[in-house]
Regions:
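Domain-level signal for soluble alpha/beta catalytic cores
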Residues: 1-132
Length: 132
């Protein structure tokens, strides 16, 4: 079972919580207690790969489960009544080493991501694997 939660960055940019007020610390402890096999994050306001690395570290510090991250490709902007994600694939991928170092065992992507984002993420994962 995968326990995956969407987090929003606080207005002051200092912490992440779900829309119901659950912190990553609480989620990690509860997921492990309930028998989840993987603790994960996806989506959310302000949840890009950099934020995913921060939450992944919190997860690792609060439970022993494998960590999966699937963040957005940045924050969308409204253009002609359409949500447009402007984060470039290289910008998403740049934070992959931090997510791996923080303990992410599985890395994917969510809203706004394109096949090119996925290719760049894979390239960075492969690069990190060659170094280790």
């Amino acid at each position: 079972m995968i326990a995956s939660l969407a987090y929003d960055l606080s207005q002051d940019g200092t912490f992440y919580k779900t829309m119901m007020g659950i912190s990553p610390e609480q989620a990690a402890e509860f997921a492990e207690e309930c028998g989840a096999n993987i603790i994960a994050l996806n989506c959310g306001t302000g949840m890009d790969m950099k934020g995913a690395a921060l939450v992944a570290r919190i997860y690792r510090d609060h439970c022993g489960l494998p960590v999966m991250v699937q963040p957005n490709a940045g924050l969308p902007v409204l253009e002609n009544l359409k949500a447009v994600y402007k984060q470039l694939p290289a910008d998403t991928a740049r934070e992959v080493p931090a997510a791996l170092e923080a303990g992410a065992a599985i890395i994917g992507s969510c809203c706004g991501s394109t096949p090119e984002h996925t290719r760049e993420i894979r390239r960075m994962v492969d690069q990190a694997a060659r170094r280790n």
